[in-house]
């Protein structure tokens, strides 16, 4: 792709690592993988849902399957030992990436951010929450957090409170001070909103939580892929994110937890791998993090996860952040040229790398369908934030989200496709 102006990253070189970006779309989808009748170039702007995977990560996974595929922690033969080393080292690599000095003992591999949230909610929340306690969230939470803690509160008798979102899409921090009090046992907050793009002051919220003896759980699904994150600087007690949003494979995520807290928690799932000893009467558990990883783990995905971290580190997370924020600001500026487009969230220079919006009198799903005909892949719906959309007074929104391989020209193609939709629905 021809570069219009300078970027914080080498877009052309990065795009060369992602063959999928060169494909065309628009043909018959009944036989996935056959693209002979596809004719429309792909413009992929759905990165908040999932990023694409570079060849370096695919190669690492293929190397595992071709070279040392074996179950881990269960064999003394060479392949098992080699796979075990790779899988354990992947934990250390991910820990290093997010600034977790405790290494593998503070990083649990899960399926995704949602499972990480459920692990803490069930393994910690069921034991620690009760009547008179409160869990504080925000009005912009993803369902992974909101629904999980909502249901745990119903089981335990705890109260759920929500920090207000103001008209600009930012948290009302004075309201947060009112809600986080001596009854609060958990503050669960999204770092970067997947709908508004808001970057929340998680360090300040961590301080508020700790002042009253509460823990804080940060949903980092949209932040770890897009900006430098140091969980110890934030002072998060728990922090979760997913591999598939950061150039990694699907089916793997990570839960960071402070070691002393994880030590005190019981397992979430039971079975093989997570036990130390078993009798007919009782069982004891493995050390961290393995007591939380029951059964055969996602070994190939772990290898790919580590490779994705290496890939992003080579680019530099400061550069990743600068690039996606540049594109988000450019998209914000382009979209604000039109009076019939409503944008949700803070201004373009004060958000993460996504823009959610609606075109007047056109449902988000209809707009998405028209954009799809132009080859532009965006996301339409409530983005797993139904209560937030209710607050915004809309059933759905259209979301464009950007990553390291996108360019301004693709934003221009988005705007051109919206123009085509506007003419069609006029």
From Swiss-Prot:
Active site: residue positions: 384 (cysteine persulfide intermediate)
Positions where N6-(pyridoxal phosphate)lysine occurs in the chain: 245
EC number: 2.8.1.7, 4.4.1.16
Cofactor: pyridoxal 5'-phosphate
Temperature remarks: Optimum temperature is 55-60 degrees Celsius in the presence of 0-0.5 M KCl and 70-75 degrees Celsius in the presence of 2.5-3.0 M KCl.
pH-linked activity: Optimum pH is 7.5. Remains partially active at pH 11.
Pathway: Cofactor biosynthesis; iron-sulfur cluster biosynthesis
Keywords: Lyase, Pyridoxal phosphate, Transferase
Role: Catalyzes the removal of elemental sulfur atoms from cysteine to produce alanine. Able to reassemble a removed [2Fe-2S] cluster of an apo-ferredoxin. Shows a selenocysteine lyase activity approximately 280-fold higher than its cysteine desulfurase activity.
Assembly mode: Homodimer.
UniProt protein name: Cysteine desulfurase
Source species of the chain: Haloferax volcanii (strain ATCC 29605 / DSM 3757 / JCM 8879 / NBRC 14742 / NCIMB 2012 / VKM B-1768 / DS2)
Biological classification of the source: Archaea, Methanobacteriati, Methanobacteriota, Stenosarchaea group, Halobacteria
């Amino acid at each position: 792709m021809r570069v219009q102006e300078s970027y914080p990253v080498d877009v052309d070189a990065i795009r060369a690592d992602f063959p999928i970006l060169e494909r065309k779309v628009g043909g018959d989808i009944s036989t996935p993988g056959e693209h002979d009748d596809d004719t429309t170039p792909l413009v992929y702007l759905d990165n908040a849902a999932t990023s694409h995977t570079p060849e370096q990560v695919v190669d690492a996974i293929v190397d595992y399957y071709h070279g040392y595929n074996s179950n881990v922690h269960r064999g003394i033969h060479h392949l098992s030992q080699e796979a075990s080393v790779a899988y354990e080292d992947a934990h250390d690599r991910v820990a290093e990436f997010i600034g977790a000095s405790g290494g593998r003992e503070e990083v649990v591999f899960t399926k995704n951010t949602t499972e990480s949230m459920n692990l803490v909610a069930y393994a910690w929340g069921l034991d620690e929450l009760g009547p008179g306690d409160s869990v504080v969230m925000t009005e912009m939470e993803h369902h992974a957090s909101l629904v999980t803690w909502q249901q745990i509160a119903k089981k335990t008798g705890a109260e759920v409170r929500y920090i207000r979102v103001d008209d600009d899409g930012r948290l009302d921090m004075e309201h947060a001070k009112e809600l986080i009090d001596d009854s609060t046992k958990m503050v669960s907050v999204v770092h970067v909103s997947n709908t508004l793009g808001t970057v929340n002051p998680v360090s300040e919220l961590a301080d508020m939580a700790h002042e009253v003896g509460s823990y804080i759980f940060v949903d980092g699904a949209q932040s770890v892929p897009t900006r430098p994150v140091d969980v110890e600087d934030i002072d998060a007690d728990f922090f979760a994110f997913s591999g598939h949003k950061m150039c990694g494979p699907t089916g793997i995520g990570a839960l960071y937890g402070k070691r002393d807290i994880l030590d005190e928690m019981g397992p979430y799932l039971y079975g093989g791998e997570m036990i130390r000893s078993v009798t007919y009467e009782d069982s004891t558990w493995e050390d961290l993090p393995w007591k939380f990883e029951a059964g055969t783990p996602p070994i190939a995905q772990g290898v790919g996860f580590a490779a994705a971290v290496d890939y992003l580190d080579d680019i530099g997370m400061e550069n990743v952040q600068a690039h996606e924020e540049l594109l988000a600001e450019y998209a914000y500026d382009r979209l604000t040229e039109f009076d019939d487009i409503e944008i949700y969230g803070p201004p373009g220079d004060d958000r993460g790398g996504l823009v959610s919006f609606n075109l007047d009198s056109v449902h988000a799903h209809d707009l998405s369908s028209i954009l799809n005909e132009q080859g532009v892949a965006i996301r339409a719906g409530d983005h797993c934030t139904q209560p937030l959309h209710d607050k915004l007074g809309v059933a759905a929104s259209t979301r464009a989200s950007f990553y390291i391989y996108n360019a301004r020209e693709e934003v221009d193609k988005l705007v051109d496709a919206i123009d085509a939709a506007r003419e069609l629905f006029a």
